[in-house]
């Protein structure tokens, strides 16, 4: 019943109007799984390769017909007749056939779309929701939790055309009792933030991830307007709602220094920038900082972990790129204490589950994440629940590509009830 009988790849459009790969995996008995690969803007240099055509006459060179061709050709031929329930086996066939370290032959976008579509098809054949199938693949059947959202309500950096250096300013509704309540709290703060910004004569256009992208005078001002919005929404900052930031520091790392336009083009050393962040954590209840230094600045990260690692969650995104080899090295060297998990940085479900397991076994937290280029595919919601990861980062309270994931979490919570607790603050490293 779970034998693969047909594989289809197609070029679809993502939330930025760029092409991406969608795949369908059809099984005996009429079961079908469909999934699409996301795409990042600020990318780590060691991510698996997203294969683009480079033909400037189509989609400004961003077409994915080569990756789609790989799905419809060699990948389909290799997995036809195989058992979709053997996820690790299917992923291994594709990875081995690609034959490169970074999946540059077929493209991580091709392999990932098929990998996720295969998991969905297998779940359908087993007559179970995707999160339940993922929990079984993860070796943790029946163990679920609802993730605490990191809601990106002010966008800067590569995600917005403004003078804010830090890429994301997020809220985490840690005081909620359920994910549904957390989403309501996030929505209320989001709407109050619009009022605060309008009251200051600021722009309320949104960035790639649905957060506002106002022209603020400094990075600290972004935190100040969020604090104002939290209060206006009737919540207590630090108790009901905590703050998180994604610096994406590689984007403003120039010649060994961190150059911040929002701080008057001041250049910081690794140590100075760490203390700049430390000062912000003293002024505001920031409990999580992602990519607080450049991905190659491991000495700086060791220092940052020493200074801040006992107090707050330090998340590695560009730093670790969902790669177990790099994460293992980071764990051994005491770098950061959390990993951001992005399917397409590594390119298959099996490797993604391995990264989550390695992180958890080492006492690191794992934050499941979207990319800035997304589709209506909500697989990351099921991944977060099925691995009991504890945290999810999937944008703001606008744009249907972001909201699709929140709505899926609401549905899953309704189905699981008390079997999937929302643990709030306890999920965040250093906050239990």
Swiss-Prot record:
It is an enzyme of class 4 (lyase). GO terms for biological process: glycolytic process. One of its GO terms (molecular function) is phosphopyruvate hydratase activity. One of its GO terms (cellular component) is extracellular region. Its cofactor is Mg(2+). (2R)-2-phosphoglycerate binds at residues 167, 342, 371-372, 393. The keyword Cytoplasm applies. CDD domains: enolase. Mg(2+) binds at residues 246, 290, 317. Keywords: Cytoplasm, Glycolysis, Lyase, Magnesium, Metal-binding, Secreted. PANTHER family: ENOLASE. This is Enolase. It comes from Salmonella typhimurium (strain LT2 / SGSC1412 / ATCC 700720). The gene is eno.
């Amino acid at each position: 019943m779970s034998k693969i009988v047909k594989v289809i790849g197609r070029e679809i459009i993502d939330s930025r109007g760029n092409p991406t790969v969608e795949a369908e995996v059809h099984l005996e008995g009429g079961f079908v799984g469909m999934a699409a690969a996301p795409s990042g803007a600020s990318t780590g240099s060691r991510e698996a390769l997203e294969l683009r055509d480079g033909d400037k006459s189509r989609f400004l060179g961003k077409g994915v017909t080569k990756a789609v061709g790989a799905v419809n050709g060699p990948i389909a031929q290799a997995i036809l007749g195989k058992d979709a329930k053997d996820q690790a086996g299917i992923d291994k066939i594709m990875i081995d056939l690609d034959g490169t370290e970074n999946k540059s032959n077929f493209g991580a976008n091709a392999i990932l779309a098929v990998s996720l579509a295969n998991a969905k098809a297998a779940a359908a054949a087993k007559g179970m929701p995707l999160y339940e199938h993922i929990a079984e693949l993860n070796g943790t059947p029946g163990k679920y939790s609802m993730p605490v959202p990191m809601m990106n309500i002010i966008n800067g950096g590569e995600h917005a055309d403004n003078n804010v250096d830090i890429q994301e300013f997020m809220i985490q509704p840690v005081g909620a009792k359920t994910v549904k309540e957390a989403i309501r709290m996030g929505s209320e703060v989001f709407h109050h933030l619009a009022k605060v910004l309008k009251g200051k004569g600021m722009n309320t256009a949104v960035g790639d991830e649905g957060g506002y992208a106002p022209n603020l005078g400094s990075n600290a001002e972004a935190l100040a307007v969020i604090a104002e919005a939290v209060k206006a929404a009737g919540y207590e900052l630090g108790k009901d709602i905590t703050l998180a930031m994604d610096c994406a520091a590689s984007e403003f790392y120039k010649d060994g220094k961190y150059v911040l336009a929002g701080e008057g083009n001041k250049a910081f050393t690794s140590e100075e920038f760490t203390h700049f962040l430390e000062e912000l954590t003293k002024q505001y209840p920031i409990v999580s900082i992602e990519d607080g230094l450049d991905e190659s600045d491991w000495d700086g990260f060791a220092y940052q972990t020493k200074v801040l690692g006992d107090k707050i969650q330090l998340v590695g995104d560009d730093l670790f790129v969902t790669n177990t080899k790099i994460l293992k090295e980071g764990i051994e060297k005491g770098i950061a204490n959390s990993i951001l998990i992005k399917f397409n940085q590594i390119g298959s479900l099996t490797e993604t589950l391995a990264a989550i397991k390695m992180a958890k076994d080492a006492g690191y937290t794992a934050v499941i994440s979207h990319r800035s280029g997304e589709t209506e595919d909500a697989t990351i919601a099921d991944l977060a629940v099925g691995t009991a990861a504890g945290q999810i980062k999937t944008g703001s309270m606008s744009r249907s590509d972001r909201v699709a994931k929140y709505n899926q979490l609401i549905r899953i919570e309704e189905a699981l009830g008390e079997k999937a607790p929302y643990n709030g603050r306890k999920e965040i490293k250093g906050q239990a």
